[in-house]
Amino acid sequence: MDGMSKELRRFNYLMGEIDAAYHEAALNLGLSDSAMRILYVLCGCGSFRCSLRKVCLCSGLSKQTVNSALRKLEGEGLAFLEPIGTKGKDVCLTDAGQALAEGTVARLIAVEDAILGSWPAEDVEKYLSLAEQYLTAFREKAKHLGNR
């Protein structure tokens, strides 16, 4: 195996630093990483309500981690699960949960929007396009990691 390229080392460093910055933001907001991600997804849904499946998918967290964090949020009176149909569940924020999300995660989203808003539109589009290309290629190639 050849060594890791300089570009890949830089990429991994930046990814790690971004993760660390979001962890620091969660701490500054008084939230766990998983609670922040769940609240973030629920803020993005617009109604502070979203399917459990979508929360798992959009948060990047495992179902087990989401369920564990939701139990904690439920215990604190911030969220509840509502059955939908025969199998589905929606994650809903209580009034207290909505107030928490508006006072924490909504502020984080405003920071992110301000950063992207300060970039030229073509830079934002290029950044997002390259990130999507990387994600698509990585998913495709990762499918074959088990095959030798």
Describe the function of each predicted region:
Residues 20-65:
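N-terminal helix-turn-helix DNA-binding core of bacterial DNA-binding proteins
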Residues 1, 122-148:
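C-terminal regulatory/oligomerization modules of transcriptional regulators
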Residues 71-128:
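Charged, amphipathic alpha-helical coiled-coil/dimerization segments
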Residues 10, 22, 51, 111-112:
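Hydrophobic alpha-helical segments typical of transmembrane helices
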